[in-house]
Amino acid sequence: MREILHIQGGQCGNQIGAKFWEVVCDEHGIDPTGRYTGTSDLQLERVNVYYNEASCGRFVPRAVLMDLEPGTMDSVRTGPYGQIFRPDNFVFGQSGAGNNWAKGHYTEGAELIDSVLDVVRKEAENCDCLQGFQVCHSLGGGTGSGMGTLLISKIREEYPDRMMLTFSVFPSPKVSDTVVEPYNATLSVHQLVENADECMVLDNEALYDICFRTLKLTTPSFGDLNHLISATMSGVTCCLRFPGQLNSDLRKLAVNLIPFPRLHFFMVGFAPLTSRGSQQYRALTVPELTQQMWDAKNMMCAADPRHGRYLTASAMFRGKMSTKEVDEQMINVQNKNSSYFVEWIPNNVKSSVCDIPPTGLSMASTFVGNSTSIQEMFRRVSEQFTSMFRRKAFLHWYTGEGMDEMEFTEAESNMNDLVSEYQQYQDATSDEEGEYEDEDQEPEEDM
């Protein structure tokens, strides 16, 4: 019941996904061979959200793994939980996308997409009542961004009424892997705005900062970064998988977080984050969790919520705690920081409580916020995009795969529109109600 189909694409997506399955297997007491070794009935009660039970009693993840080169997939297959996946669900090409969005979206990816869709269909048919899809990918490369967005649009066509949640790793401001990241990211955002329902925005630099500052890791590896992401991913869906007092699911999350359909890019955070050594000395209380969860340093993307305002937010608490205390703390946050919330959406913070904490913690919380300050991410990518596109730098790699310059111009203006929309609602106040009736006709001055 309420199954979620997980899809991971590209190197980044597959590495995050592999880590995520380690976390979920751990929570449900499933060992690397797919056998259940847990102790609590609660682990099995709704295990079928993420797993299929095979005839021999093994649990197989509802996961589709795709990439345009075999490398990363081989390392997933030989990794700790590599044997748990269905062998047919590994779909890969041989050529690679070479960090080129056009290869992932139009040429190489388009050749592979049908075999991916076959696997997706097969998995979806195995579901009793499919809730939606979650996609892990990065926006800077070729496969995750190009082929990832292609798959999202194809799934959108075939399953228009199912939720589409993405965990998208944006290019970082200072750390860059490839020079064409701004192109790939802008072309991807153009697709995500139209075809995804909810995008959790992540970025390596913010994750590095958390590892470095909060977790006191001197040399964080991608494994550490991906562990943070997977904690958040597991938190977002814990209400579907374990009983709770105040439940939420992907659709409730969307209804509560998205006031305007295009503005569905969320910041995420997780608490408690403590360095490995000092874990056991920390007393966890709901106020402490709440404080850390709302802390700007805790956000997993390089945008500062203090530079904008929250349209909406949602907090998912896990563990044995009083619902009353959770509600009081959330109201408290809103009252103390009222200037950071838009006043024209009353009660814009939703909380949910799930009784089962993550492994090794007594309580934890996941934060998802829709803040106008996320425009900082888009602005930054857009500036980098424009400075290259103005000179038509590296463009031949894309036009050579059959793309047209028009597509770049469209993607650029779509991203700039998105930024303006966020800015417009950031500046809006509740006494301006009358002004919005005729906004379509009048050009706005502040754009």
From Swiss-Prot:
Leader sequence segment: none
Biased composition (Acidic residues): 429-447
Cofactors named for this entry: Mg(2+)
Principal location class: cytoplasm
Record's subcellular location: Cytoplasm, Cytoskeleton
Family designation: Belongs to the tubulin family.
Function: Tubulin is the major constituent of microtubules, a cylinder consisting of laterally associated linear protofilaments composed of alpha- and beta-tubulin heterodimers. Microtubules grow by the addition of GTP-tubulin dimers to the microtubule end, where a stabilizing cap forms. Below the cap, tubulin dimers are in GDP-bound state, owing to GTPase activity of alpha-tubulin.
Protein name as catalogued: Tubulin beta-2 chain
Organism in which the protein naturally occurs: Triticum aestivum (Wheat)
Gene transcribed to yield this protein: TUBB2
